[in-house]
Amino acid sequence: APRIYKLALSRKPRRYRAPRRPVLPKRTIYSESGNGGIVRSGHRGLRYSRSARRLHSQVRRLVRRKRLSSAEKLIKQRRFRRLGQAHVDIAKMRIGSRWFYLGEDRKAFNTASKAAHRSGKYYPLGHWYAGLASYRSGRYVNAADHFQAMAATGGQSRWSQSAAAFWAARANLVARRPDRVSRWLRLAASHPRTFYGLLARRM
């Protein structure tokens, strides 16, 4: 990623602001697969009761402490499942993101993938980690599907959309679906002041 960042800087048009440096996870096989300026988005349209906020806070605390098995047990409890499927799915996606950072791609995919397809509109970042885990484990079609879904979700920052669109193009190319590459590259390139947008414009 540092080399790609330097390349992006060297090819940056004069009047454009420099792209933000990508933030990389601690362990990754593909260095470009860091956060890359992804902005965490709110859970649009989903209601949070006091109980829901408290339980999600417990999940976040367990995830931060890397107690992922405990977090998975918590969301299986009746009091959590009573919140509804979307809340359970958001918790699963959050747990899956930590499995990804720990290098457990299979666990990340199994935890986050179905949850992202069901409830990714509330937590688009779930598609990001499910997509990266899929890509890193060689499931390129699955990766492309997740990145496409994230890129198509409205209300995100230009950083998030350009990153998802760029990786959708990349995953489709590796998955030998060249007919699906140009659309996503164009979408990424429509945000030229972002890291991935600038890369897309040079491809």
Specify the residue positions occupied by each region the protein language model found.
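Solenoid-like repeat scaffolds
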Residues: 1, 12-14, 25-32, 41-48, ...
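Solenoidal tandem-repeat scaffolds enriched in leucines and small polar residues
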Residues: 33-90, 94-95, 107
